[in-house]
């Protein structure tokens, strides 16, 4: 950390209240005292810091780099030169987070255990490169402590154990649900609101919105310059019937980067579940575990799905063809093409057509 920059203080506190051990009215009621072994509420709040950074740890330093040099005199000899590199961030500090948690713990009937927590994290002073500084300044700049994100949700587990004769068993369910959002990241002012990452979840994918396939009638309108012709991509490769068709979000008649918006869900599950079951009988024991993640999207591209990538898939049999279109058959894939730069390429034109949502 650079000289003169103070490290902000961090700390935390927690409180808990165990009703069973503190309240006499529980002990005065036999059923409660017998069947509820633990009933506790707790809460905590704290500010924590992190000095983990990626790459350069000396962001506060001004960087100078070797330049192209200059020729002096009559002989061809280049004299090295130096130029400014990325501007330093003199008051860089660690990233911080305000963490709040409230929870409930219960033990019932000497068999059931329950733990549930709600959490809310506000992360701020996150190190990111500013996107709102114009490149006209002619020099790079180091990351700044400017970004802010919110993460909140709940998690917990429920356990049950019992015995039947010589057979002991236990089962356990764990769960977690969390949502996050970018509050601020100093991104450049976007021409259209749907291009902004601020206000979206972390790792939100952006791309085109698929609205169907170009039809032979669409191609006729495009070639004739009809006013109601659908928008076409900004490329030298003309579209053909059976190509994927995307929404023209700004209604300018061209499919380009200005038509990219948030598609699908982040590739980070918001919900995770797990279930385990175990038993013991006369020296034999076993355990099984199932777990899953839900509420996220992932993209399929390349050899896994695109045509002529040496991986013929069953879905390619449901591709667009003139015959299928005329017969009104179900079509689930665009026309096959070996050109990797067409509008049908997931690498060149990423869209929600290529996304799979996990519940």
Predicted ranges, named:
Residues 1-68, 84-86, 90-359:
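Outer/extracellular conduits and scaffolds centered on Gram-negative outer-membrane beta-barrels
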Residues 71-87:
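Surface-exposed acidic, glycine/proline-enriched linker/cap segments
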């Amino acid at each position: 950390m650079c000289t003169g920059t103070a490290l902000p203080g961090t700390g935390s506190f927690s409180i808990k209240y165990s009703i069973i051990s503190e309240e006499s009215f529980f002990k005065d009621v036999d059923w409660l005292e017998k069947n509820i072994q633990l009933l506790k509420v707790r809460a905590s709040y704290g500010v924590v810091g992190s000095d983990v950074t990626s790459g350069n740890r000396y962001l506060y330093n001004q960087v100078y780099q070797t330049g192209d040099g200059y020729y002096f005199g009559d002989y061809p000899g280049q004299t090295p030169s130096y130029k400014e590199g990325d501007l330093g961030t003199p008051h860089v500090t660690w990233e911080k987070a305000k963490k709040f948690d409230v929870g409930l713990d219960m033990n019932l009937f000497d068999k059931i255990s329950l733990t549930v927590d709600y959490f809310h994290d506000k992360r701020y002073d996150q190190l990111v490169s500013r996107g709102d500084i114009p490149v006209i300044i002619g020099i790079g700049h180091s990351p700044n402590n400017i970004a802010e994100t919110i993460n909140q949700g709940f998690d917990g587990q429920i356990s049950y154990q019992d015995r039947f004769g010589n057979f002991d068993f236990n089962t356990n369910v764990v769960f977690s649900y969390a949502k996050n959002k970018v509050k601020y990241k100093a991104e450049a002012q976007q021409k259209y609101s749907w291009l902004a990452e601020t206000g979206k979840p972390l790792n939100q994918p952006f791309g085109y919105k698929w609205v169907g396939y170009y039809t032979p009638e669409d191609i006729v309108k495009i070639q004739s310059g009809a006013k109601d012709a659908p928008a076409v991509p900004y490329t030298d490769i003309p579209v053909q019937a059976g190509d994927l068709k995307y929404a023209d979000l700004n209604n300018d008649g061209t499919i380009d980067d200005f038509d990219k918006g948030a598609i699908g869900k982040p590739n980070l599950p918001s919900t995770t579940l797990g279930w385990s079951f175990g038993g013991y009988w006369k020296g034999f024991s076993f355990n099984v575990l199932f777990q899953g993640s839900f509420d996220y999207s992932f993209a399929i591209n390349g050899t896994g799905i695109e045509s002529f990538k040496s991986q013929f898939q069953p879905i390619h049999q449901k591709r667009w063809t003139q015959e299928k279109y005329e017969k009104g058959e179900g079509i689930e894939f665009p026309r096959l093409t070996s050109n990797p730069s067409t509008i049908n390429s997931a690498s060149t034109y990423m869209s929600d057509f290529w996304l799979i949502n996990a519940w």
